[in-house]
């Protein structure tokens, strides 16, 4: 969970901490609707853990979207009624009832969910608001392995985000 920064700042962080991987062959979907980053982060994670048993609906969604680009995959996800119902059942009532009505909202910091996980021998960052998955390189298989690398990368990104935020003020 990260404090959300406008996309130009977010892109700068990824460029410093890793490399975009436009050829990423794992499961990666863009977030194409508001307030869905937690659900999308979970899907981006589940879609990259082949050993994890899934229910028939999720297995069908992952299979159906194989080979699609991230934008199209995101659109397919938003059209899955069963997934929207599950997402909305976990959303606070205000997020459902006020969304799209144009009513003024209290100014709050925005936060965003991002997934870090090992895929194909490298640590990847899967952020549905970024144009591609971000490859953060290989990791030591011993000890904490990819978790240690993910912690280092996220600490670096938080430090850079704090620096960008303090400059903007």
Which residue stretches match the model-derived regions?
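Cysteine-dependent deubiquitinase/ubiquitin-like isopeptidase catalytic cores across multiple families
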Residues: 1-169
């Amino acid at each position: 969970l990260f404090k959300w920064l406008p996309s130009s700042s977010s892109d700068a962080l990824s460029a410093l901490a890793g490399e975009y991987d436009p050829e990423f062959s794992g499961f990666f979907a863009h977030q194409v609707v508001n307030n869905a980053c937690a659900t999308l982060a979970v899907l981006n994670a589940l879609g990259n853990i082949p050993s994890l048993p899934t229910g028939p609906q999720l297995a069908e969604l992952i299979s159906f979207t194989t080979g699609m680009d991230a934008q199209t995959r995101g659109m397919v996800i938003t059209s899955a009624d069963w997934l929207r119902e599950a997402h909305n059942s976990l959303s606070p009532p205000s997020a459902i009832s006020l969304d799209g009505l144009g009513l003024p909202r209290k100014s709050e910091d925005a936060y965003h969910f991002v997934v870090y996980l090992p895929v194909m021998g490298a640590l990847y960052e899967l952020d549905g608001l970024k144009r591609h998955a971000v490859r953060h390189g290989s990791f030591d298989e011993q000890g904490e392995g990819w978790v240690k690398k993910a912690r280092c990368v996220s600490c670096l990104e938080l430090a850079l985000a704090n620096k960008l935020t303090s400059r903007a003020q």
